[in-house]
A protein has these predicted regions:
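Residue-level detector of anion-binding/catalytic polar loops
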Residues: 5, 54, 103, 140, ...
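Short acidic/polar active-site loop segments enriched in Thr and Asp
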Residues: 5, 80, 139-142, 203
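Glycine-rich phosphate/diphosphate-binding loops that line cofactor/substrate pockets in enzymes
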Residues: 16, 133-142
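Alpha-helical recognition/docking segments in bacterial nutrient-uptake
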Residues: 16-132, 195-200, 211
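Hinge/beta->alpha junction and helix N-cap segments in small-molecule ligand-binding domains
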Residues: 26-39, 57-65, 119-129, 145-192, ...
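Flexible loop/turn connectors
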Residues: 188, 192-293
């Protein structure tokens, strides 16, 4: 009678089903640092809520939980799509998720042999930026602070590091590499052991992540080294602790909130209009210059 259109009101109701964000923990060495994980989840949530779905975050522990039972339970839930944190996963553990009857987007890891949708950080580019900056400032052969726990992300960062070393006319074989635990306390303890053994130290280092970089800086300072005057360090991830350590950490920033948004957007697109082709989206990195170089 009055010409009102009530059709839009129905669109605001929650849609049937939930988006599941699955955090897969194998050794828990990386995902246990929650701020990076939380930022990606917050990004997902902002997109999912706009589309009136619910987001449920669940964690699978490889050493404790049974994957077959876990996947069977997922089939009987209200799940309509999965965003799978691939950070700590191996290819053989991903395959069963791709057999589920709903779309999957893999976040924070890429598996060349699996046909799936991916949203990943551009690790090679970020590591290249960091290493090239180190070399331009120090004019010396850089070293590498490598995680003692291997991850695909770290392998890609090593490739970017070596690419920058090569492009600057330096030899890969001359790079000093220390394997350290990927946590602040663990890296500090491991680096103290490196120093106390009298191992050769590099003039500057790129670290697999900020936790390793911060632990290394703490160890160097405990043993009387001045950072960056004697040894420079660049991290990766731009975590909040890097801003408050002395000296503040030069690092690589990845927009994790945005990564979560993009992953959710891709999944929602697949739910609304399934397509045969898949894509890999790489989110670019930025160099954040502070005072550790």
């Amino acid at each position: 009678k009055y010409g009102y259109d009530f059709t839009k009101l129905s669109l605001k109701k929650n849609k049937a089903g939930s988006i599941y964000a699955v955090s897969y923990r194998s050794h828990n060495a990386i995902m246990s640092y929650s701020p990076i994980f939380d930022a990606m989840v917050e990004g997902m949530e902002s997109m999912v809520q706009k589309d009136n779905y619910k987001l449920k975050v669940i964690t699978f522990y490889e050493k404790r939980d049974n994957l077959e039972h876990y996947l069977e339970d997922l089939r009987t839930t209200d799940c309509v799509g999965i965003i799978l944190f691939g950070t700590e996963m191996r290819e053989e553990m991903v395959r069963p998720f791709l057999k589920l009857p709903f779309p999957v987007v893999i976040l924070d890891a890429y598996f060349e042999n699996l046909n799936c949708n991916y949203v990943v950080p551009n690790n090679r580019q970020g590591a290249y930026l960091a290493t090239d900056y180190l070399i331009s400032r120090r004019m010396k052969q850089p070293g590498y602070l490598q995680s003692a726990y291997p991850l695909r992300n770290f392998s890609e960062r090593l490739e970017g590091f070596y690419h920058a070393v090569h492009d600057n006319g330096m030899s890969r074989s001359r790079c000093i590499i220390h394997q350290l635990s990927p946590s602040i306390d663990g890296a500090m303890a491991d680096m103290l052991a490196v120093i106390d053994r009298g191992d050769a130290l590099a003039d500057c280092y790129f670290a697999d992540n900020d936790l390793i970089a911060i632990g290394t800086i703490k160890a160097l300072r405990l043993r009387g080294y001045k950072v960056p005057e004697q040894i420079a360090v660049v991290g990766f991830d731009n975590i909040s602790e890097g801003r408050i350590i002395d000296p503040a950490l030069t690092t690589i920033s990845i927009p994790r909130h945005y990564m979560g948004q993009v992953a959710a957007r891709e999944l929602l697109s697949q739910i609304e209009a399934p397509r045969q082709h898949t894509c890999k989206i790489e989110v670019s990195a930025n160099l954040v210059k502070r005072f550790s170089v």
